């Protein structure tokens, strides 16, 4: 691995480590997303805590955290594998941020950015899948999980297995991070889109 590739991966991780949910809630003088609602510093919890505007800002920044480094890797290296690894590092930064004690979000919004950066078709697959599941079930977590699996595995059909591997690893990590959501979906206790923030319960 040359210096350029290494620098891009480090940049992706560090950018991913900037937790927009925590910063946005601080700016809007809202409770910390780590102590209210689900306890997850992500877009869905910010929506429950502060409404649409803070949530939209959080979502946009989290998407850009994935999009920007992947596009940079794509343009500067022209190497699909390095670009896919850049996506993985951005996700790792978001989920395990060095700036916030390695305790971050669940990576879904950042994944959207990486997918659009890697291939707009993959990004579109994610968004369409998420919307379809969300409209039918009103479960944000279920929508994210289904869209993550379908979009990540779709890379296999557009690239070779080596390039797809980082995205498959991302899917596994996101599934593991949603373990609590999966358990509540099975038990019927998972929060739905539009529910207000309650005591910390580790939902999406």
From Swiss-Prot:
One of its GO terms (molecular function) is acyl-phosphate glycerol-3-phosphate acyltransferase activity. Pathway: Lipid metabolism; phospholipid metabolism. It is a multi-pass membrane protein. It holds the Pfam family G3P_acyltransf. The keyword Lipid metabolism applies. InterPro entries: G3P_acylTferase_PlsY. One of its GO terms (cellular component) is plasma membrane. GO terms for biological process: phospholipid biosynthetic process. The chain crosses the membrane at residues 8-28, 53-73, 81-101, 116-136, 155-175. It is an enzyme of class 2 (transferase). The keyword Cell membrane applies. It is found in: Cell inner membrane. Its EC number is 2.3.1.275. Keywords: Cell inner membrane, Cell membrane, Lipid biosynthesis, Lipid metabolism, Membrane, Phospholipid biosynthesis, Phospholipid metabolism, Transferase, Transmembrane, Transmembrane helix. It catalyses: an acyl phosphate + sn-glycerol 3-phosphate = a 1-acyl-sn-glycero-3-phosphate + phosphate. Belongs to the PlsY family. PANTHER family: GLYCEROL-3-PHOSPHATE ACYLTRANSFERASE-RELATED, INNER MEMBRANE PROTEIN YGIH. Probably interacts with PlsX. Catalyzes the transfer of an acyl group from acyl-phosphate (acyl-PO(4)) to glycerol-3-phosphate (G3P) to form lysophosphatidic acid (LPA). This enzyme utilizes acyl-phosphate as fatty acyl donor, but not acyl-CoA or acyl-ACP. HAMAP family: PlsY. This is Glycerol-3-phosphate acyltransferase.
